[in-house]
Design a protein with these regions (language model features):
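Helix-terminus/linker motif at the lipid-water interface of multi-pass membrane proteins
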Residues: 7-32, 38, 56, 94-103, ...
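Hydrophobic alpha-helical transmembrane segments
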Residues: 4, 39-43, 111-124
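C-terminal structured "cap/appendage" subdomains that terminate the fold
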Residues: 125, 129-155, 159-166, 171
Length: 207
């Protein structure tokens, strides 16, 4: 998965440098890539911890506890990412200024952070679904979701947006498009799996 992130970095920088000829775009993307880890770190902490709970209850065939853990995880991750979105929407200038004391990319950074952060709540659902796939033995679907959201849809969308609109600001929408594509695939796939694998499980002991 780390290699996917590396390829995404190379691809995005190539779009900014070779197609849009924008050093500000490259710098802004670099700042975002550093800051986003602060938002996503607690999300990954919650989902990684939840994955073992999902796997245990799936293996124990305890439907009620599985569903309870899943709903709680989704709620917590949604809250975390909603807070992240609010911070990026309300304080983008302050965040960017931490990395741009001279104000060279402040305007670009404000626009970028406000657009990109729109995908944070969607990412909460995407990543929760992705770890669910891992927990119940559908790792290929989890990997496919990661590829969709970080590479397969994101880079082509960024390229098309850059070529069509010829602006750095338009490219940031690729994050929203990619996340929406990934969560759509995830919801459709998980709905089928839930019907055939989760719902038939016995109730178990309610906790």
């Amino acid at each position: 998965m780390q290699s996917i992130g590396s390829i995404m970095n190379v691809g995005m920088n190539a779009i900014f440098s070779r197609i849009l000829m924008s050093n500000a775009g490259i710098a802004t993307f670099g700042v975002y890539f550093k800051v986003q880890s602060i938002v996503f770190m607690p999300l990954f902490g919650v989902t990684n911890a939840s994955m073992s709970i999902f796997a245990y209850n799936y293996g124990a065939r305890n439907r009620l506890r599985f569903k309870k853990a899943w709903k709680m995880t989704l709620c917590v991750t949604a809250i975390i990412m909603s807070i992240g979105t609010l911070l990026f929407q309300l304080f983008p200038q302050q965040i960017v200024s931490l990395f741009d004391s001279e104000g060279k990319i402040t305007a670009e950074g404000i626009a970028a952070f406000r657009i990109i952060s729109l995908h944070f709540p969607i990412a909460a659902a995407s990543i929760t679904i992705s770890v669910t796939f891992q927990a119940i033995g559908h790792g290929i679907k989890s990997m496919f979701m990661s590829i969709l959201r970080q590479l397969g849809v994101l880079l082509p969308a960024a390229l098309v947006l850059a070529l069509v609109f010829k602006s750095v600001e338009s490219v940031w929408w690729c994050f929203v498009i990619a996340e929406f594509s990934a969560v759509t695939f995830g919801i459709i796939s998980l709905t089928k799996i839930w019907k055939h694998e989760i719902e038939p499980m016995p109730d178990g002991a309610a906790v």
